[in-house]
């Protein structure tokens, strides 16, 4: 295990996040398990409060090695598709056989998903400093149909950058969405890091 990768992601030592996740893929699960990464299970449990049909198709945006899908499955969700920018992460997720479909995409192009295809989209530990920029928020949100749910998190490093929380406030204030859930809690316990978990419903 290379414990330095958690430091590198927050210090954004890689210009292209694909390079970071290429190098991190083999040790990613072990490093996050040893540091007690809790945001995925917090988000999955929160979703259960608002979803009655757990067989509803979910898009796990930025699925990585599948840690978020594992949390979702542990909470009873069963039909999950994943997309990510890292081939190396996708291959590890594929070996777990927990996704219906997996696809790697180019972050410099449009997200390869049809509008209204999924009524639930998750982006758990994805939109943050050192990973997907806040500019991707609207593109992901726009894929949802009316009444669709967007479950996502911002870690505390991202919460220190005003544009992250302001994006949520703007989306709600412009009556594009209603906020169903917002909770600050543990993100990576061994690093004493926190994250905010959100669930918003598209109007």
Question: What do these predicted ranges mean?
Answer:
Residues 1-26:
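N-terminal, positively charged/glycine-rich alpha-helical extensions of SAM-dependent methyltransferases
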Residues 111-121:
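A short acidic, Gly/Pro-enriched loop at the edge of an enzyme's catalytic core
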Residues 189-203:
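Core SAM-dependent methyltransferase catalytic element
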Residues 29-44:
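Conserved SAM-binding loop and adjacent beta-strand
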Residues 119-133:
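A short SAM/SAH-binding and catalytic strip from SAM-dependent methyltransferases
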Residues 135-146:
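A short glycine-rich, Lys/Arg-flanked "PGG" loop and its adjoining helix->strand segment in the class I
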Residues 59-111:
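Class I SAM-dependent methyltransferase SAM/SAH-binding core
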Residues 147-155:
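Conserved beta-strand signature within the Rossmann-like core of class I S-adenosyl-L-methionine
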